[in-house]
Amino acid sequence: MISNCGYLAFFLRAIPHSFFIFATRRKQLNLTDKKIAIIGLGYVGLPLAVEFGKKYTTLGFDISQNRIDELLKGKDSTLEVEPADLKLADKLSFSTNLEDIKKCTVYIITVPTPIDKNKRPDLTPLEKSSESISKVLK
């Protein structure tokens, strides 16, 4: 169990009937004084990080340094987000350094969960990202 994790959310992609798992210690979630971490900056994570980053302090985390470098230059090679929207997200920062997520209080994991021919999800990316996060939150 992650003891100092205030909020934790997982978005499981590529699973039929998208699953959303959310655990919270409070009934209402006021994000004004929170720092949000979006883990995984693909087609789900980046647009989410940009929208949160327009209003709330948000850290976009990805394991790919190339991905972070392009986003820091205001470019998105996947074309999920327009350069103008990236500029509007003035409370959004990017990093590949796991230590940077220590200061976050809300964690949203948006990593791939591809399905096999039997429509079973491969949860390996989710498991690995969760393990990585747990190391810095101890």
Name each model feature, range by range:
Residues A9, A14, A23-T24:
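Ala/Thr-enriched low-complexity intrinsically disordered regions
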